[in-house]
Amino acid sequence: MYKRQTVFLPHLEKRPEAAIINTSSIFGLFSVPKQSIYSVGKFGVKAFTESLSLELEMSESNVEAYCVFPGHVGTNIYSSAKFKSFEKDDADAAIFGANADTKEQAGIQFKQNAPSSPKHAAKVILKNIRKKNKRILIGIDAHFYDLMSRLFPKSFLKIIWILPFLRNLFKSKN
């Protein structure tokens, strides 16, 4: 990320206006169990983008830096991820593929159950760039999790971790 941006930045600065858009994740705003390595990378994207944005502003550059925090967007990210194993009762399976017996089924469910589509995400990003909002949340889930993590920083993670299990419990009884 850093190398690409240092290569492209001089070219972007020659334009009347330009934008650098880095994609983090809602897991770049808070962490959950079993996602520590992923969160480290996404928190890093957030920190890098915030620092870059300030540097560009201080140098009076015409380039703006934005950080996107998508929630659950219907993509193939889950089905293309590499897992050591997939267990139906595993927490990741409960979150991403609630009723799946295989990783492939979980990937399909993940995509189908997404509250946001890639097309919707693109529209939200463009709308926020036009408004000069540097921090862009994608999806109602991202807004909800962001708000809840701010309001209830200690209990939020416990609530989030148990929600999929409760949802599965009620689905199986109906």
Show which residues each predicted segment covers:
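Short, small-residue-biased leader/transition segments that mark boundaries at the very start
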Residues: 1-2
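A transmembrane-helix-recognition feature enriched in membrane-embedded lipid enzymes
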Residues: 133-166
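A short helix-coil junction within the Rossmann-fold of NAD(P)-dependent oxidoreductases
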Residues: 7-16
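Active-site helix of classical SDR
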Residues: 5, 41
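Residue(s) in the substrate-gating loop at a strand-loop-helix junction
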Residues: 25
